[in-house]
């Protein structure tokens, strides 16, 4: 079993930002149409993350022309170019399936405001 974990750990991506359900993300992924390859962005609310290791996936939901669209992305897929965290959401659930029934303003997630880091002050105090 350790051999499998070793091989999987080599394939894991290191450039994935820290995000969780409730966050709004923009996923840039490669789409192959015919012989052409282009990058397409999909922005929406993360409603769940599941699994671990190489098989970890996350589901992003957005409303497009009045219709809810959900897309499941493998987290460590080579087709994902990058993941941007647009805003952090304040939720108390790991799976946000209840958002599917909500419409309009009721489907909004409160934004989580983080205090700015004070790394500069800490470094100045240690140098003095």
Swiss-Prot record:
<protein>
    <recommendedName>
        <fullName>Large ribosomal subunit protein bL19</fullName>
    </recommendedName>
</protein>
<dbReference type="GO" id="GO:0006412">
    <property type="term" value="P:translation"/>
</dbReference>
<keyword id="KW-0689">Ribosomal protein</keyword>
<dbReference type="GO" id="GO:0022625">
    <property type="term" value="C:cytosolic large ribosomal subunit"/>
</dbReference>
<comment type="function">
    <text>This protein is located at the 30S-50S ribosomal subunit interface and may play a role in the structure and function of the aminoacyl-tRNA binding site.</text>
</comment>
<comment type="similarity">
    <text>Belongs to the bacterial ribosomal protein bL19 family.</text>
</comment>
<dbReference type="InterPro" id="IPR038657">
    <property type="entry name" value="Ribosomal_bL19_sf"/>
</dbReference>
<dbReference type="InterPro" id="IPR008991">
    <property type="entry name" value="Translation_prot_SH3-like_sf"/>
</dbReference>
<dbReference type="InterPro" id="IPR001857">
    <property type="entry name" value="Ribosomal_bL19"/>
</dbReference>
<dbReference type="InterPro" id="IPR018257">
    <property type="entry name" value="Ribosomal_bL19_CS"/>
</dbReference>
<keyword id="KW-0687">Ribonucleoprotein</keyword>
<dbReference type="Pfam" id="PF01245">
    <property type="entry name" value="Ribosomal_L19"/>
</dbReference>
<dbReference type="GO" id="GO:0003735">
    <property type="term" value="F:structural constituent of ribosome"/>
</dbReference>
